Amino acid sequence: MSDEGYRELVESKSAPTTPGPWSPDRERWKRHEAAWKQHCSWSHGLWCHCHDWTRHLKKETRECGSGTESGEDPAVSFDLVDDAAMLAAAGDAEPGAAGGG
């Protein structure tokens, strides 16, 4: 095999020009998603003991509309609270605590 033919063979077998399944952005996204899911699981455990926070997610399809005339979805809240507020609310919900059952 000539040097020219060998070089062409090596270049044709080198890394693809299109990005593969791994990238730094994809890796960062996966880590952030995992952290978010862990936080969802942890915060769910503060108020519910079913051990499966995903059961509370509303699966919306095109056939079903929203829950209100204004278009709001009562099953989803976008109110962001910090951990201290969440722990305070969880403390109020514990049996024997003020306001709790």
From Swiss-Prot:
Chain spans, region Disordered: 1-26
Record's compositionally biased regions (Basic and acidic residues): 1-11
UniProt-recorded name of the protein: Uncharacterized ORF2 protein
